[in-house]
Amino acid sequence: MKLSRQLILLLAILSFSACQKEEGPDTDTPTGYESLQSKSEKRGVAFNFSQLPDIDIPNLGPACSWSYNWGVNLSAEASALFAQYGMDYCPMAWNANWNEDTFRAFKKAHPECKYLLAYNEPNLTDQANMVPATAAEDWGRLVAIARELDLKLIAPAMNYGTLEGYHDPWKWYDEFFAIEGVSWDDVDGIALHCYMGSAGGVKQFLDGFKKYGKPLWLTEFCNWSSNNVSADAQMKYMVETINMLEADPDVFRYAWFIPRGHGESQCHNSLLGSKSPFALTDLGKVFVNMSTQDKSLWYKAGTVIPAEHYNSCTGAIHLAPTDDSVGVLSLTDLKKDTAVDYQIEIPEDATYTLTLRFSTYFETALRVSLDGSSLGLADLPNTDYKWDIFKVDLPLSKGRHTLSLSGTTAFPVSLNYLSINKL
């Protein structure tokens, strides 16, 4: 009953107005804020950290929980940095040409190792190049070493193939796991590769493997739908796809291809620069700093909330390195049919000020909702792409709530941060 009275009061008194900047410093803009979200347990990269581990791992480690390099071993320097940044390394048997003692030595040196990845794209002629019968001949040996070393085995990594008769990855899987001595009970996950050019295409591909009832590992992905993918298109693809992967409970892990590689001029997929100081690219900044959709985080009143750290999102929202004076990323393209949710924790019944740092190029509006109920529209003026402050006072009740911001027109809004402060 208390919540109902609160919503009625909000609907009755809520009025929105933009705070216009005055000459001089903008005292409403914080000098800095920190990330409070937890690292994603899913997020990783497919990469060999052999050349610049002392630079590359500190750059990616704050966001990455795991990695693999298509081989067995990891350098001592990289291993130490993986431990420092809480990254899990997964060795791989790339094809049937592997040695038990190599895996035994690795496991002895790395008792924390939990997974073993099986053959890399066996239905591609320039990769593992194994028909199901050939893979089955080696499979018992691989299952045996995984059990001996207490490693969870992940099924061969599948993509659309070039091996005659096995372009269809489902056909390869179905034939392989029907062979005597091979069983779905042998594996604890399915590895997949996908280079489609849209998040929807990736989702459709992944959904096709859910029939096997195993956790999905997307161990290679980026937009490589052609050899002419722009940096902007790649960034939008990455944000949309990672948002989908983080939200899908059937996706256990995913790994971006590739932090640094030869395809940069073709599809702009590099997370790391190829020249000194080898820093994060703009794409890398987004990969490292975008939302992990952390469901355990509740932002307390008085905390500056980076707009890119939404708890969940709807529609094709995008992110980019911010051009504001504070922050790392900005949320862009918040318009009709898109929304972002933030979990907030209010310490006591009181009136609080909601502050939005925004920019637009058209007069537009955002709908503000609390726990699924609309509180009203925030009418935003045209700021000519300049950053401005919007404020409104809200009476809020003690407890945890979900604050939602959704677009209402075709004209996009960019957000840098938001905050809720007691009057």
PLM region spans:
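Sec-dependent signal peptide recognition
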Residues: K2-L9
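Bacterial Sec-dependent N-terminal signal peptides
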Residues: F16-K39
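N-terminal carbohydrate-binding/catalytic regions of secreted carbohydrate-active enzymes
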Residues: G44-C113
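Aromatic-rich peripheral "rim/lid" segments of glycoside hydrolase catalytic domains that contact
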Residues: D88-C90, D248, F252, F257-E308
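Aromatic- and acid-rich polysaccharide-binding/catalytic face
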Residues: P91, N120, W172-S225, F257
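Active-site groove signature of glycoside hydrolases
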Residues: H110-P132, I154-E164, D185-C194, L218, ...
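Active-site clefts of carbohydrate-active enzymes
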Residues: A155, G161-E164, K211-M238, F257-G273
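Extracytoplasmic
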Residues: D294-L423
